[in-house]
A protein has these predicted regions:
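Divalent-metal-activated hydrolytic enzyme cores
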Residues: 205-206
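Conserved alpha/beta-domain cores
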Residues: 2-194, 200-202, 214-216
Length: 221
């Protein structure tokens, strides 16, 4: 995996250090995460609080000296915000005003710094997670007002069956609009196991890779 990232960075004239690999460990036990910690990896992504919360506690038990950074990458329900903030420092899926309101309520209760991305909906399906690009500036304004929270940029998932390059072009366009409002919010959380090399070529700063690192999910997951 690291060799593929290095090759993609070399091909696009980028430094490997500019791309953060977030290992998606959903449906895998804390023991698998511990193996990755032993290899020196410390950035992990989860998409369900009911799985991630106990997993983070278990990892702290079996690797008490490790200091992982947990990324929450799934659609975040407002009633799960408080629980997620107990372990995740980076939220990749901010997508609506009600979620920002709950973050504003809960963030002051926690110490340390947090950061995250606004998730974009690249489809015409309003039921899918993410904010439509035309609504990005208004949502960004509210995120920028959060206490102790840094807006890093935008996140998106390329649609199934869609050309990832064309999809990521939409993300780049939205990112440029966001930077007019918040110049430092220039990071891109794009790219998964199937398309991370395209994402790196398009400027990804965070890639979210699961099966290419951990292998297939357990059959009972």
């Amino acid at each position: 995996m690291l060799a593929r990232i290095a090759s993609a960075c070399l091909a696009s004239g980028r430094n490997e250090s500019d791309v953060e690999l977030v290992a998606i460990t959903k449906n895998h036990p804390a023991e698998v995460v511990a193996e990755l910690v032993d290899l020196g990896h410390l950035h992990f992504g989860e998409n369900r609080d009911q799985e991630a919360s106990p997993k983070s506690l278990r990892l702290a038990e079996i690797r008490p000296d490790s200091k992982p950074t947990w990324h929450f990458v799934g659609q975040l329900q407002s009633n799960k915000v408080k629980s997620v903030l107990r372990y995740a420092r980076v939220i990749h899926s901010i997508d609506r005003a009600s979620l920002v309101s709950e973050l504003a309520k809960q963030l002051p209760k926690f110490e340390g710094s947090y950061s995250g991305f606004i998730e974009l909906n690249l489809t015409a399906d309003p039921g899918r997670g993410g904010v439509l690009p035309e609504n990005l500036p208004a949502l960004a304004e509210s995120v920028l007002n959060l206490e102790n929270f840094e807006l890093l940029g935008v996140m998106a998932v390329a649609g199934l069956g869609e050309d990832p390059k064309a999809e990521f072009e939409k993300v780049l366009s939205a990112s440029r609009k966001l930077q007019e409002l918040a110049p430092s919010a220039n990071q891109l959380s794009i790219g998964m196991s199937e398309d991370f090399e395209v994402a790196i070529a398009m400027g990804a700063t965070h890639i979210r890779v699961g099966s290419a690192i951990t292998g297939p999910r357990p059959t009972n997951a």
